[in-house]
Amino acid sequence: MLFRSREMVRAVMKMLFQVSAVELTPDVIEDTDARQILTNLTDLADNGKIDEAENQLYEMTCDGDRQNLEIGLLFYYHLNGKDDEFLEASNFSREEIMMGIQDLAERYNLSGIAEAFRTEIL
């Protein structure tokens, strides 16, 4: 599931934001403020505060701003690159990552993409 979900996020980033980098990092975001927001979120996650980072992301993405969609997709891409031991120690799971991506896609009215991630969960 790890590889396929990362590939799916990479495909969505290419379709929506014309990002074709081999590895998706904060550097693919052109806007420096948005890049810093993503870095802050991934730093929280890297320190085991995934729930806190995800809550901040949720608040940001309620406004429908496409830049925040890009941040969200990259956040979950980063998170999905973590090993299972790290996720477990942070009280998080791959299923929660997939549900987060699905929820993000639904908030941006990307129902086809949300359905693809829903299928990936099952």
Predicted segments with their positions:
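Amphipathic alpha-helical binding modules
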Residues: 73-122
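Residue-level signature for tetratricopeptide repeat
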Residues: 39-43, 47, 78
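Alpha-helical junction/boundary sensor with strong preference for TPR arrays
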Residues: 12-19, 51, 63-65, 83, ...
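Inward-facing hydrophobic residues that define packing positions of alpha-helical scaffold repeats
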Residues: 5, 12, 50, 56-57, ...
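Amphipathic alpha-helical repeat scaffolds
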Residues: 9-13, 38-42, 58
